[in-house]
């Protein structure tokens, strides 16, 4: 996992959150006043620039300059209000406000601002659902794989014929861009510094739903390829939403458990014993046909992912072939972030099963070979140790430079 917030950068986290909230509020205000219209069904960002949160994230010095400058502007505004309300101290108030503006460490605008698109602040309507990921796979296979490759590494059969090799999707690239900007790159295409196209525009070929779906699939593809080649998920990945069917109850979206309950997905094909229920998390069976086993013994898990598409999506995220999926388990934390993967037939959960860790956030990424592949060395069992660590190290995902 390479896109979290460092524990010692709480102030930066707060600054980014405030800046994002301010931009969203400004966008909503402009839209409400009729100063900007819609683009692809959502309010369009009316300016060619936005605050470069991704730059501030990697340049704390620049972020401090901006923070002090914002503070100076706030102080100057307060001084102006005080001067208008208090005549006797008018001169002193004006002077203090002017001095604050003069002494402020104004950052270079070209560093603080970055190019924006009309869809920069768009939000995906898909909820990162299994159905959307499955749809996105079909779109990707038809329109994207020839250049980006089946595994997303940018080595498709047409890649060598392009003026520039496609970027790999099996890395933190998707985590550095807001979903709205990824959407714009797909519909409007991309150009190099020389103005020549480096990626065709698909705005006339794909509908909005297809574009959002292929973005969802690229996230799953990135996770699976990263897990297979590097032993980690390159960026934090949410547990995909899907319908959950439990015995005697109406289907519910998996998102209903987000924020309250951990989730364990276990792939079963009818040939292995069902996992035991565990009060520490919701155990959800993933089956090839989306139906629960005919016989569920007492104390065994019986809730099932009620869609056959979940099988292929889980295999993609786990980075294993669909035929090798039975017995694989995925763990998500209470906030819905996927954190660990258990291999079939594994006797105990191990430290290396944790594929999304806060320790990787500061760039101290461990390779799969460097991690010790032994059970977690704690007085408790390996699974309990992993759950405790997941709770102690929550994911604070920064996408497009802003906290999600």
Regions found by a protein language model. Name each.
Residues 136, 140-150, 199, 214-218:
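The canonical Cys-X-X-Cys-His
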Residues 195, 291-334:
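Short, internal strand/loop/helix patches
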Residues 160-163, 185-212:
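Axial heme c-ligation environment in periplasmic c-type cytochrome domains
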Residues 116-139:
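Electrostatic cytochrome c docking/interface patches
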Residues 228, 261-262, 319-404:
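Thiol-/selenol-based redox modules, centered on thioredoxin-like
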Residues 254-288:
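Short active-site neighborhood of thiol/selenol oxidoreductases, capturing the structured segment around
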Residues 78, 184, 203-226, 389-392:
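C-terminal capping alpha-helices of c-type cytochrome domains
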Residues 137, 153-183:
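Gly/Gly-Pro-rich "capping" loops immediately C-terminal to redox-active cysteine motifs
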